[in-house]
From Swiss-Prot:
GO terms for cellular component: extracellular region. It comes from the Eukaryota. The keyword Secreted applies. Its main location: secreted. Keywords: Cell wall, Secreted. It is found in: Secreted, Cell wall. This is 66 kDa cell wall protein.
Amino acid sequence: GPLNAQHQS
């Protein structure tokens, strides 16, 4: 899987 994940709402 990804090493860095970000979520913006």
